[in-house]
Amino acid sequence: MIREIVHYDAPVLRAKGKEVDPTSPAIQKLIDDLFDTMRHARGVGLASQQIGEAVQVAVIDISGVKERPSKMWIKGEPVDPEDYMPMILINPVLKPTKTKITSHEGCLSFPGLTLDIPRAQRVAVKTRTLDGGHFEFDAGGLLGRAVLHEVDHLHGRLYIDHISAEERREIKEDLEYIKRGEPIPEREED
């Protein structure tokens, strides 16, 4: 079922998600709703907080995104990330590298706002599977960025938390538009 995406300033976006039982039928329903909602919004990732539920569940699907390549490794061996899409993250634990890369990011909870965000170049991921097991992989490129972005949501962190105070002042007006549910007006380039 397609659910409403919660926009910036909703308290649930700052809520740390509770761990869940991955085998629960309620979690499967939540995952189905996350995928339906993400695809309807044409996103590459969506966290449970973004549809109003503060639990540690997120979904990602970078299939077909060629302009921003993804990388994935399992047990140190490179694999094709498309073979593992769509992806479900349940109670994920991350270990990001110290090396950072800055690239542009958007967020379905911040419609129309794209920012340059520094993120780890690569991240090791351990997540639960629907049968209660574990799945471990490393991710880089767009997939790594999407994992880091969505798992931030699961802990009540937003991509605007990664920008400087000066940049935050520059987007203050845009954030007010989003809070009111209004589109950010087009601005002329300097």
Briefly describe each language-model feature range.
Residues 1-148, 153-190:
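Active-site rim/adjacent substrate-binding subdomains
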